[in-house]
């Protein structure tokens, strides 16, 4: 099961890399960039995600070089499969840049990481994915976070809520890869 979780994370890292290449190609004519649509991609310490404002942030502020550098350093731990260090780095990143351009992606990756660290922290994963949906409803990571929320609720034994999220992904993001993952998960588990 652990290896399957790690393989799933590797697929998301690869997908993020491809999205980042597309974003970079699109942004080549826009040096300033607005930060919208960015899709970069032991035991971990527990935390909660309650110190972020509760209002939707559909368009985060543009990233400054220090923020981008801190985000890339944290993401580097994901790529090198040092998941506990990645959790720490993303927590620190969000402490410094809670409303930054990369904040939605940091929450997404914390959600992913809390599912693969040992021991897994599904409630913290749920909190980060839900925060992404609530505060950044237009972010490119929303379909993936919604799919992951379906899986987290399934792991926690809440099949009804799981199905709601998975069906919502299929209904609202039918052309997105997360919709096919949701269909597959429903076929295998319901």
Predicted ranges, named:
Residues 1-80:
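Acidic, proline-/serine-/threonine-rich low-complexity intrinsically disordered segments
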Residues 80, 117-119, 156:
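Structural motif corresponding to the intra-repeat A-B loop/turn of tetratricopeptide repeats
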């Amino acid at each position: 099961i652990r290896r399957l979780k790690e393989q799933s994370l590797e697929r998301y890292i690869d997908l993020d890399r491809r999205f980042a290449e597309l974003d970079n190609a699109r942004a080549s004519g826009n040096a300033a960039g607005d930060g919208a649509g960015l899709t970069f991609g032991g035991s971990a310490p527990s935390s909660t995600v309650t110190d972020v404002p509760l209002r939707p942030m559909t368009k985060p502020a543009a990233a400054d070089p220090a923020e981008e550098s801190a985000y890339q350093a944290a993401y580097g731990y994901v790529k090198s499969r040092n998941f506990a260090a990645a959790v720490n780095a993303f927590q620190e990143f969000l402490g410094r840049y809670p409303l930054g351009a990369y904040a939605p992606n940091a929450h997404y990756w914390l959600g992913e990481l809390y599912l693969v660290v040992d021991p897994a922290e599904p409630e913290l994963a749920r909190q980060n994915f839900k925060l992404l949906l609530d505060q950044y409803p237009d972010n490119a990571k929303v379909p993936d976070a919604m799919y992951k929320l379906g899986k987290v609720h399934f792991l926690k034994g809440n099949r009804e809520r799981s199905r709601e999220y998975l069906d919502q992904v299929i209904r609202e993001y039918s052309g997105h890869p997360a919709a096919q993952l949701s269909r597959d998960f429903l076929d295998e588990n319901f």
